[in-house]
Amino acid sequence: MGKGARSRKERAQEQEQKAAQQQEQKGKRRLRKALCGLAAILVLVLLVFGLLYATGTLQRHMTAMTVGDSKISGEEYSYYYNMLRSNFLSSNESYLSSMGLTSSTLDDANYTEDMTFGEYFRQQTDSTIRVSYELYNEATENGYEMSQEGQENYDANIQAVKDAAKKSDISETKYLQTVTGVSITMEEYEKILWKDALGKDYYENTQAKEYTAEDLEAYYEENANQFDLADYRVFQVFFDAEDEASKTAAKEKADAFAAAVTDEQSFIDMAKEQAAEDQVEQYSEPDGTLTEGAALSTSGTVIDWVKDSSRKEGDVEVLEISSNYSVVYFIDRYRDESESVDVRHILLPVAKDSDEEAKAEVKTEAEALLEEWKAGEATEDSFAELAREHSSDSNASKGGLYTGINESTNFVDTFKNWCLDESRQVGDTGIVETEYGYHIMYFAGSRPTWESSAEEALTNDDYNAYLDEMDKKYPMEQNDKVIDMVI
């Protein structure tokens, strides 16, 4: 019985061991299944992450920069960057083409000696976003509500996108993505535009100042070098920079010339008599030595001497400039009293490859808009409102206003010629064709150039001073890794 009992006991133990082993094997199988499941999930997560990263979706929703407590996504940063770059390309197409630069080669080319175009666009994007959020944050913090004019401007801009999308027979989101090059929805675009519009409206209606004639006069007196012009004459005596004897002889000739000058006419006569062989043609003319209307806002050896506040008519000086000695005769310094004009316009664009029929359609549309304005109140304010609704120019939000236009303004000739026509009267209208399309014009008035320039400078000074305070209140931080991935 003992042996049999032991056998049964052993068999029971063996069965228990087998059961335990089977349970252990089941546990291992369950663990392997669980681990396999986790691995599959991890692979899927990595695949999704990789897909989001590869398509840029992840980066676009990461924070690219902050302004105070506001977070700017990579997508929004990309929108601002692309729009700034696109506007620069379209505005400077002729210049860039003459420099042999294209959209694909532009970013690595030098904008200045120390900055590439790509770095310039990045800098401008940072600044634009910062200002937009600073003004928006101030508006919301102070409980500001959009003005009626601001709301109308915003609505007009949104409607312009909707109309353009409808005309192109595509969705609004698709249109925006085509124009901006960013995966942005209409809803996201409206939010960006609203922030920008509310901030600008807040500043213009609560912070911007209006200046009196006395304000402008005082600003001019304090900053005359920014606005004054000067007339002077220059006679140059060249030398070989590597030949000391040549340099000494040139200095002696220049000093003798200066010492012999008694008045402006003597300067003219001596320049003609002492001209080097290659200067005879230039200095034989009475105006060969003359510089008129030189802007004192610039700098240089001659200009720095001319704009010295102690300078008086008849002053003569010999100045060394590179490889010549320049004898300079001061004639006059004066405020620019020439007239500059203010105009409003509505741009209806014409594509470059448009045929005559397409151009005629746009011209007809321009004529109809002008007649619509004439049939209404026909005031400058009503014209400005029409510009906000219909103009494709970048200044549409300002009612199509351009100020301070004069002969030196870099505008298309046909546009500038209409503005500067001496017969022009306040309230005059017309239609001007340029390479950009048809412009419906409104002449708003004229005033002395110095006054227009002083108001613009004073406005900018006050605006920049305000932004300096905002920069302290809303510090900016950039996430360079995200930015580099989205631009």
Say what each PLM segment does.
Residues 12-60, 174-252, 256, 291-371, ...:
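PPIase-associated folding chaperone regions across multiple families
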Residues 56-186:
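N-terminal targeting/tethering segments
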Residues 266-280, 381-392:
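Short, well-ordered alpha-helical segments enriched in acidic and aromatic residues
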